[in-house]
Amino acid sequence: KVETGNIPSVVIMNCVAYGNGYIESENGLIDAGNGNGFKMGGSSLPGSHVIINSVAFDNKAKGIDSNSCPDNVVVGCTSFNNENSNVALYTNDAKNTNYRTNGIISYRNAYVKVADNLKARGTQDTAKLYDATDYYWLSASGDAKEASTLLTDANFVTLNTNDVKVTRNANGTINMNGLG
């Protein structure tokens, strides 16, 4: 935070964030917390925080949130059906951003009118933010960077998150058991 300065780079790898912002009770789900999946950064301070091979789905707010950090790195991540942006890379006060992405899949079949929030500033090399392997949800039509490359439900094994059982493989990677 501003009072203490930026922190060293944090690396999140092979992780899953789902259902954040809710607590199960006897009467169903109740609101609790801000509901972000992966929230990386704050106060427009640089940190070069890294998230690799991770999945965010069914969160009350954003799936992957830079939280105003201007230089996050996102590699091989999937974000699906979060109630706010699946992917939000933005800053409030930094003059320049240096986001680096590769292999992002952002997809929805719910909350389809909610686009990803991608805001390059200043000296940002947009090729690093819009890599050819990235699929962002830019509108209700599911636009990718190139309109000829759209994802549909058919691109996924299953999108049923109600029955998914998230486990780990012996090597530590995520086993989504068919989701995605």
Regions from the PLM with identified roles:
Residues K1-N27, K39-M40, P46-K62, P70-E83, ...:
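Right-handed parallel beta-helix
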Residues G63-S66, N86-L89:
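Extended hydrophobic-aromatic, low-complexity segments
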Residues E83, Y90-G180:
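Acidic, glycine- and Ser/Thr-rich low-complexity intrinsically disordered tracts
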